[in-house]
Amino acid sequence: MKAITVTPVTPRIGAEIGGVDLREKLAEETVERIREAWLEHQVIFFRDQDLTHQQHIAFASQFGELHVHPTVPHHPDHPEVIIIHADENSLQVAGDGWHSDVTFEENPPVGSVLRLTETPPDGGGATLFSSMYSAYEALSPAFQEFLDGRVALHQLGNLPGARHDE
């Protein structure tokens, strides 16, 4: 078995994983090493992985039960897969503001497994990530104390599928 490499990309968040072929069913030790890297670095990525929808689903399933987004259109044959596409004719770009996927649900998924298949010819289309652990640690002790123990209410708004439980 080829050794997995974990290379941090910033001091606070993100690591590149190498030495693994996501098209294959992974050994439990490999899944555990990837899970550890994810927990430590919060965002992980794998280069040069040409996956089908089925392989994408199979990889993600090794980390837990998959979620079907209640408000976003999904692939007709794979409800766990959301197709996000924008081009020069698009009137709106999905996810263009800071957000965390599906946090409006009572039990949101622990994470998202993204797969990029096409990039804009001009090099745009960046996806940015931020560490909320680092953001919290950068707060003053007084503000941390103010926030500790508080609960946030995340709402989806008036989109189809949004719940407004009191």
Regions found by a protein language model. Name each.
Residues K2-E166:
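Non-heme Fe(II) oxygenase catalytic core, chiefly the N-lobe of the double-stranded beta-helix
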